[in-house]
Amino acid sequence: MKPLATLAALLAAAAPFASQAQDQQALYVRSLAATCANCHGTDGRAVVGSTMPALAGMPRDQLLTQLKAFKAGTRPSTIMNQLAKGYTDAQLEQIAGYFAAQK
């Protein structure tokens, strides 16, 4: 019975660290996406009257396809090609997921 109590205590002690890691990951992804606010608005909600598309709530796969096309240079753009090249594919996936989750 004692090993079970020890295991329970260890799991309880580790829970705050798991939560902290999730918080840090969320902050990291939000900071990646913050670059987009300059043109696409805070959290991807475009400013009314802007010619820039809103990113908030767009399907993740659609966003990711566009971001990868910008990075590859197959989708013409004035600045997005340069910006997208600065991110890894994993970061682009995180950014697409972030904006897709914004409602």
Task: Describe each model-derived feature in a short phrase.
Residues 1-23, 103:
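N-terminal export/targeting leaders of redox proteins
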Residues 13-33, 51, 69:
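Electrostatic cytochrome c docking/interface patches
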Residues 22, 58, 66, 91-94, ...:
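Glutamine-centric residue-chemistry signal
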Residues 27-29, 44-71, 81, 85:
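Gly/Gly-Pro-rich "capping" loops immediately C-terminal to redox-active cysteine motifs
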Residues 34-42, 95:
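The canonical Cys-X-X-Cys-His
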Residues 37, 65-68, 97:
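Generic alpha-helical structural context detector
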Residues 40-45, 100-101:
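Detector for the c-type heme attachment site
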Residues 75, 84-103:
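C-terminal capping alpha-helices of c-type cytochrome domains
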